[in-house]
């Protein structure tokens, strides 16, 4: 566990940022923190609620703030992964070390299950979902998209999250969709 900003302090930070035309994103893990940040005017969440299932109150707060974006950054399923498909793409000793570290972790499985249910429900309720990963470059974005589908989003919705919604979140008007005048 780590120290967190108080609602008064993060509210002041959000207000000050907005006065200067800046948007604010915060890491969130708990339902109560999400509610407080939504009330304070947060623009986007990195990660998602993983301590308990979302309730009607937080859904109403999201409805009141339709421009808020959720970037789930799912924590990984917690199940040992078969990484053999990486053979030949990275040094064999690194692959062996990665496979040895990939073990079943019950706590991670529980957190993934909660966050996956919440992602599915928030997506179904119309919350804008964008894309991010804490796994670094390379194959991890693909694993993140697979986890988003495993969580209950449709493959099409995941592609929209990874392209259009992410470009919109980053205010990259020339990216995100295949349209005349945009970079492909």
Task: Enumerate the language-model features and the residues they cover.
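His/Asp/Glu-enriched, well-ordered alpha-helical/loop segment
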Residues: 103-184
């Amino acid at each position: 566990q780590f120290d967190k900003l108080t609602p008064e302090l993060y509210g002041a930070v959000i207000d000050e940022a907005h006065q200067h035309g800046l948007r604010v994103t915060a890491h969130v893990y708990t339902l109560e923190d999400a509610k407080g940040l939504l009330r304070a005017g947060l623009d986007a969440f990195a990660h998602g609620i993983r301590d308990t299932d979302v309730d009607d109150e937080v859904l109403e707060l999201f409805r009141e703030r339709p421009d808020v974006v959720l970037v789930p950054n799912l924590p990984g399923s917690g199940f040992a992964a078969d990484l053999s498909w990486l053979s030949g793409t990275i040094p064999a000793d690194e692959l062996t070390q990665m496979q040895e570290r990939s073990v079943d972790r019950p706590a991670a499985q529980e957190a993934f299950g909660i966050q996956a249910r919440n992602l599915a429900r928030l997506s179904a309720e119309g919350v804008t979902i964008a894309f991010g990963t804490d796994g670094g470059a390379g194959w991890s974005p693909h694993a993140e998209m697979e986890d988003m589908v495993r969580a209950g989003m449709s493959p099409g919705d995941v592609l929209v999250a990874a392209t259009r919604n992410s470009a919109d979140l980053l205010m990259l008007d020339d990216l995100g969709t295949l349209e005349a005048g945009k970079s492909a």
